[in-house]
Amino acid sequence: MSFFELDENSPKVDQPHGLKKVKLKDHQLTSIAAMRELETQASIVIDKPEIGSKFHASVGYCISDIEEFKDSTFVIETNSAILADKVGAGKTYTTIGLILKALVPKAHDRHITGTDNFSIKMISAKECEPVNLIVVPHNLINQWADFLDKSKLKYLKLNAESDFNAFLDIDYITKVYPLTREQISCKPIKNKPKKLPVKTTKKGGSKTQNKAQNDQKIYERKSLNMKKIRQALDTHNVFLLNVYRYKLFRQIFLTNKRKWARVIIDEMDSSAVPSIFDEYGNFNWFLTATPSAIFNRSCRRYVNKIFGQRQNLLNYFVVKNKEEYVDKSMILPKPFVFMINTMIQRVVAVFKDLIPQEVLQLINSGNMKEAITKLNCDVDTEENIIKILTGKINTELHNLETELEYVNNLIPQDVDAHENRKKNIMNNIARCKTKLESIKEKINSIKDECCFICTDPFENPTIMNCCKSIFCLKCLLTTLKTVGSKCPYCRHAIKSNKDYQIISSGGTSNKKKKSEIVGKYKFNEMDKADVLEQVLSYISKNDENPKILIFSDYSQTFEKITKNIAKANLQYAYLSGTPAHITNLITEFENGITNILMLNSQNFGSGLNLQSANYLILYHRMLPELETQVIGRAQRFGRKNNLRVIFMVNDNENRDCRLDSKPINILSDSELWMITNPTDLNEEPDEESDEGSDEDVEKSKDKKSSDKKSSDKKKSEKKSSDKKSSNKKNSKKKTYVKPKSSKKTSQKVKKTDSDNESELSGLSDSDDLDDSDDLGILSDSSDSDDFGNLSDSDDLSDSDESEIEIPKKSKKTSKSSKKNKIGGSNKTLKKKAPVRKLIKV
């Protein structure tokens, strides 16, 4: 049986008896069946493995005959495996169901040692304890306790130090003695109670002696009580252990080594399993959604004990359902995904290729102090990053020049080798000087704010992704049209507007078409913290009960953005502290007392159940595996409503999305209504639709957002247009408007009607903006409602003598315009409509 890709055709078990009001899903029953079979047979059969497979890479070197290898059947004997269902699939309940099905799994012979010709197995006569040891991270122990309370299992929670008193005797003494083997600790009491049974060596005496005895230090001594230990083992099915308390746990059970029924470690990929961990059971289970990561964490020593260095064989030890089967079994509501592009510092944008990825990640998270520390800089400014980068090159240059001077003073034994060494050093010196000169030129170009093309101060400065050169946006667009869509500096082909980045320059702002970005605040011109403030403020005003999770890899990030979060008038908290404090914070969040919960993804990115949240914000991009874990905190078993996932990304961060939902770009504050009311959005366009249809969708989104924001203004405009139309009706002759330059106008309209999208997207738009200002051309924006909508059959004449009639506004046209907006019929989105432009009266 294959345990790696379980599906609906795989065997299932019946609902385990002992779960209170919890019915397991089909995929969970399938996992329990596979886990029970693996525990029973303790072996995995591999029949006729392929040459070149991971199994062949691991064991093929032991077999010289390839034909024998291909035709053979292999058996892996194991007492350890990994439950690796996807994030949020309910692995905790699956594990509890496994224990309820069989409290103690079958014991198997243990391989001790051997060679190719013999092996030694141990048939152990030692019986295991009827207790399942579950080791969990400190932030999940109360969550596990809540799940165990929903079953009939009897468990002992070992979280605080006082929980271990169930195994100990405690007495109080005034004098410290060396600890015996049965004694665990002897510590002084800080707050001495009034009445305490203290053992003293002397009795009686004067009042002064008694007073001196009262002033003596009192020590609390803890000793093992074997009867209490035995009683705890006999009366409990599960020991629930905080991984941070393992040292104390080991002290108690080290004197008499125990063999457990099962050892289960939750979140094996992120749990801080200590190096001294040495617990085994009849069968060992590790729970994680990312099994490949267990070799890279602090538990690597324990994992290597079990699996050795056979990482290629890891999939054979994994019990996992197919993700399609899990999705079908759970039927979770599909999340809405939003992308908000924010502004990165201009200097960082230019030199992002020279900044280490680790430091760039810190900058993206807003953790500039840590970024400066990584670069050995003292002051928190972007300019210092450039100084450090040039300083490293200067240091390398100095070392090379010193080495060249040293080599020149040597008396060579091999002249050719000596000359080659000098030549290599000189080439490296030239490389450093060129690199340093290039950086200085870029710095001067930014500080002087002078365009290479027009030699004037920058207007809408734009950085090329190919060579990091900076130009005015207008100069760049003009040059791209004349030289054939190539970079003016390095001649690299420019295929779309993604090949360059428009950045802010002091007080100037990016001039974009109103149809592209509508709103008071354009997010690509704002700092990430300010954008977060706008998003939270909008949610606060338009959602009665917001529950928001904000994740970042760094705790220092939250120190910076707390001021912005506070301005949103929402109650917020940072998740940290003891398990009891964490549980209280989560309870307040679920009850709506706290609206925003800030979490460090490194500490709380896995394991927690936070499906009550309706918004999840990733403040910066993380590792793909970690992002999956983070989103799984809310998108998991038990969720009923659609989750809104918001990615906040800078220009240098990737925009890939591993979720099934297609990301929706939020460009300004006027489009934030899509976050709070995602159900008003139309269905996604077909995959076959081209870029033109996507642009129409974006325009329709902008149209609805602008209409929604300025409805009062539209009413007044409609009234004025109605008055104009009534005046036109009174006149017998039709009114015609002739453009200033009919040739240019007809050519311009003809070009847009043909949907010539072979040109650069974004470049022609910017150019059209300049032309539209001169000719009075309106784009397909909110202003076009004053003139009505052109149908597909309407044609615009190309001749100089042609005149364009202004269509009359009627009720039919107003109804059709409403359908074109987001939230209307789906047909209008799926059909590719040409972009119409009208002549202003």
Swiss-Prot record:
Binding-site residues, ATP: D85, K86, V87, G88, A89, G90, K91, T92
UniProt feature coiled coil, ranges: 413-450
Short name of any one Pfam family annotated for the protein: SNF2-rel_dom
Compositional bias segments (type: Basic and acidic residues): 698-725
Residues in Helicase C-terminal domain copies: 531-682
Residue window of motif DEAD box: 266-269
Broad EC category: hydrolase
Signal peptide start-end: none
RING-type ZnF: 451-491
Keyword Cell inner membrane annotated: no
Protein's name according to its UniProt entry: Putative helicase R592
Species, as recorded: Acanthamoeba polyphaga mimivirus
